[in-house]
Amino acid sequence: MMATEKISPGMQQYLDIKAQYPDAFLLFRMGDFYELFYEDAVEAAQILELSLTSRNKNAENPIPMAGVPYHAAQQYIDTLVELGHKVAIAEQMEDPKQAVGVVKREVVQVITPGTVTDSSKMGADSNYLVAIDRQGVQFALSYMDVSTGQFFVTSLDDFTSLCGEIRNLRARELVIGYALSEEEEQVFSNQMNLLLSFEDEVTEDVQLIDNSLTDLEKAAAGKLLSYLHRTQMRDLSHLQKVVHYEIKDYLQMDYATKSSLDLLENGRTGKKHGSLYWLLDETKTAMGMRLLRTWIDRPLIDLKRIENRQAVVQVFLDYFFERSDLVEALKGVYDIERLASRVSFGKTMPKDLLQLSQTLGNIPAIKNILQQINEPALGNLVAGLDPIPELHALISSAIDPEAQGTITDGNIIRTGFDETLDQYRLVMREGAGWIAEIEAKEREASGINNLKIDYNKKDGYYFHVTNSNLGNVPDHFFRKATLKNSERYGTEELAKIEGQMLEARDKSANLEYEIFMRIRQEVEKYIGRLQKLARTIATIDVLQAFAVVAEQQHLVCPRFTDQRELTIDRGRHAVVEKVMGKQTYIPNSIHLNTDTHMQLITGPNMSGKSTYMRQLAVIVIMAQMGSYVPADQAELPIFDAIFTRIGAADDLVSGQSTFMVEMMEANKAVRLATDRSLILFDELGRGTATYDGMALAQSIIEYIHDKIGAKTLFATHYHELTDLSQTLEHLENVHVSTLEKDGQVTFLHKIAQGPADKSYGIHVAKIAGMPEELLQRADRILQTLENQAPTAPTHPAPSVVEEPSGQLDLFADTPSHPVLDELEKLDIYNMTPMEVMMAVAELKKKI
């Protein structure tokens, strides 16, 4: 835009508002359209496939312009937000017909990926807005689902933990309360693909932010609230009091672990199907579905809480018919959490209140079912089923069950609720009869057989007279409009009736609106009780879902022990089993204790090593959620964390290879795991040379065995490592058995004691469909190699390095190299594998 160009007052208003929201698409209301200008118009036209036009087309520099109809704007807003953009909505704040000069406009809301509450693309899943603050090396993280008002805060000790928690929350927008470093911005923006927003102001709300929080936690929570108030510009009375949590209070799993175990989505397809969530989701309500995802994300480590959940599941299993009735009743429960939020936002529609009324009407039936069961395990759930009878009575008596559309469409309030409104409606009904009487009377008096009364907004009520009958028009008719083939007439009598009817209609519409707003304000008083009810319903729903799945999948109740024993008899991977359908799943048992806490697993690819490892992790997660588990019998310790390295593609976004990712994930395990953790490593070291890979694999096994003592499953293709069982007393060898007959190999998918004797790689290639000629050539090469002297070590390195003998050193007089001196000082047996790698890398630079 040229500086010398003259800007109209309207465009100047646009530019002034746009300057306040430079990082958002500004939808500028102009009549029946939201218009976009300049760069916003160009970019939005491309994204939304809009026609790009221009304002002042004859000017030297026309202003690019694009627009969307106001009544269809939501779908365009949803698309922009879904793609990670912010959208600022500038509305007309006065009637353009009564405006003096430029119509007053203001931004009434900024919709962002983290604050969206009613997008058609949102679904029932939680949508978290995350805020962070920093003080030294300490971080605080606060997050909220604006659509439900749930509000949380925690502290983290380092940047890695912070990023891990943000990933776990699957956040799309991050509110930052401190000055970011370039490295942090690179991680958040490029690697984690977050929309970054910044907030300096802290909202101090004693109703929401507890004084028991640390100052840093208060700052993070307060900045999140401040950002919300700045962008939403509406009532947020549905926000719940912030809940402080500690990450260590739950079974800890990082994002990579959850992805590799297919907990919330299938890691290969990105879809729900084939995930643990898919298996367990027999919920019937939106609240239950969200809570189930939370429970999968955060299994418990508190035995009492786990056993409380198990007890309810057992009750629901014992009372099949009552559970069936409960399931039917839950189907009539709507999303109370989001309905309550819509009340707070002032966006409640008649259908929302009807859904709320229907839900409250179902609560007594649900409560009665649980009371009939009369089991102590259900006591707290029964107590939490508050039917709020006074609210149900208000809505059911006030809102017409056939009410449709918006609050200005009329016919919302039930007949009999308000006497004055009933009188207005009576006038409108009787007026219709009066008009019919006038029409019949004038038709007979005039002799115009096709005389009729019609209505439109411009002319109101009128007599429609065709040109052929104009000679018969009575003298007391007065002309209202002339058309090509007819004319429209009125009479004083018709005008009087019309006036009464229109007055009654307008007063009726205004009164209905007032009544609806009063009801909405009354409903707002119950938001807290509705949210508590929603939590109870969600818990009941998830636990009945656990019972349904336990029955369908033949699951058993796991027992927990503090003796560090892990025994699973004929365990199964329930997700794989369900996906297989009618095919037979081969179960496997596992026993680990203080004497044997590591298994080294060998066997061919595709034989089931990874499934066996995942099976154990999924059973642990299900058990600590309070669910039953797929086994004939299960006795488990309570784990504090699960660490995995089970397959992954190269991390192309961050520029890290498969091997680097392997080492980073292995390093995380050896640094953070305890003797109460579960470690699952699959083919660790495969991403580098044979010597390097086997050396690292052995060193990591030894470190976990000697220093950590965590329950560990370690699958490897390095057959030489099986000899470690001779020196590591807590390690045992197991393998996936095969049946070889007449040159054909069958994978039995059964875990057996001892190491595998072959890898069967060529057979796997055959299954994959490799050409026969290629396979025959590979077999000949294999036989040749097997007959030659081995080029790789046939045994692992000794667990303890022997001291040198007394033999003379030919180079004894050679001066020592500084690198050798530093190398000699390294205490490698008290270092993690990653620390050894980093030290060697530094020494290489000095050579």
UniProtKB/Swiss-Prot annotation:
Disulfide bonds: none annotated. ATP binds at G603, P604, N605, M606, S607, G608, K609, S610. It comes from the Bacteria. Keywords: ATP-binding, DNA damage, DNA repair, DNA-binding, Nucleotide-binding. SUPFAM superfamilies: DNA repair protein MutS, domain I (SSF55271), DNA repair protein MutS, domain II (SSF53150), DNA repair protein MutS, domain III (SSF48334), P-loop containing nucleoside triphosphate hydrolases (SSF52540). One of its GO terms (cellular component) is cytosol. Pfam families: MutS_I, MutS_II, MutS_III, MutS_IV, MutS_V. One of its GO terms (molecular function) is mismatched DNA binding. GO terms for biological process: mismatch repair. Belongs to the DNA mismatch repair MutS family. This is DNA mismatch repair protein MutS. It comes from Streptococcus suis (strain 98HAH33). The lineage of its organism: Bacteria, Bacillati, Bacillota, Bacilli, Lactobacillales.
